[in-house]
Curated annotation (Swiss-Prot):
GO MF, one annotated term: structural constituent of ribosome
Superkingdom assignment: Bacteria
Family in the record: Belongs to the bacterial ribosomal protein bS16 family.
Pfam annotation, one family: Ribosomal_S16
Alphabetized UniProt keyword annotations: Ribonucleoprotein, Ribosomal protein
Record's protein name: Small ribosomal subunit protein bS16
Amino acid sequence: MSVKIRLQRHGKKGKPFYWVVAADARSKRDGKYLEKIGTYNPNTNPATVELNLDSAVKWLHNGAQPTDTARAILSYKGALLKHHLDGGVRKGALTQEQADAKLTAWLEAKAGKVDAKKDGLSKAQADAKAKALKAEKEVNDKRIAAAAKAEADAIAAASATEEAATEEVAEAAEEAPAAEENNETTEA
């Protein structure tokens, strides 16, 4: 029986979530599988991969062929390296302790790279948030200054119209007695 290590799709439309499974090569994409090896979530950044390393290496030893994406996932988690190092142990080129030391060193280096990427992404996100907040504060300050200027202009215009109205009332008051005098002279 030909066995493949491949992805089995789960999740909903537009939000894929995959199981990494060992399945018969003739079975359907989402059909029966022999063993679930792990999960792969491409929706997160960086993608989340959980893998049972020993189970994956066991299937590789038994001759399972990974698909292209599954091969990339196995390589990312170190399953292919462990399979390669186990081959060296079987041939006598390495001892098991040396192989384990190489694998743990590689896994630690890989974890450091992944953590650095996560830190970089969180720092970039925080910087973008701070920059957006600064831009929003500048816009708010401009808006407040424009509102204060408009209010001051409105007050100045109101006081100018008030002064003009008082001047008109004063002129009207001066004209009214003059008009009354004119009326008295015309009656006489």
